[in-house]
Amino acid sequence: LASDFILLVAKKEEKMLPANVVKRELDERIESLEQKENRKLKKTEKQTLKDDVVMNLLPRAFTKNQQTAVWIDTENNLVHVDAASSKRAEDALALLRKSLGSLPVVPLAFANEPSTILTDWIVQEKIPHWLVALEEAELRGSQEDSVIRCKKQPLENEEILALLQDGKKVVSKLALEWEDTLTFVFNEDCTLKRLKFADAVREKNADILKEDYAQRFDADFVLMTGILSKLIENLLDEFGGEKVRLG
């Protein structure tokens, strides 16, 4: 816990059993039992055997551990999940909800349509002064499969501008740099991907000895959440605040 911020880590442990290993063991048991009893096993009997095979193999299975950080901003009533996919984020929130008994949260949505704002930034060259557009974007058409991905390409390119000005495409993803502090990809669903802090930020707490892991961890958490909170505040202001939900 730091100030108004709470950090939690959800840990998921999975036992990895290759399907072919289970099938081979199951086939051997079915064949052995059918020969012994001189009859074909019923579907329910095969399922019972399969359950038994899985239970016997589990102690020898590989274990896959997955950790998902959840940062709660109690002042602004926001829950941030560090996850590469929405499924992983939902799993972490489901665990938190189960632990608390209740967790009435919904994905953050801005009042103004993000793709419209992102497109205006590029077409009208009116990106906020605290942001720099990098040479990476995704342009989306009206059809789901109509996507153009731009990388290492100036977005003021005439062909790109023509597509945006004609309304054939909108900017659905845009790589940005915020105040020489952080780079990230902003998505039209309001998620931030590929966050990377500048070296100057990463080295700010370098004076804390590596051996003092807890102190360094706490200092980094306070520093980075402070930066992200300010960024999110800027984005909320630029996109018209949080969308009002009816009902």
What feature does the model see in each segment?
Residues 1-247:
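Intrinsically disordered, low-complexity, charge-rich terminal extensions
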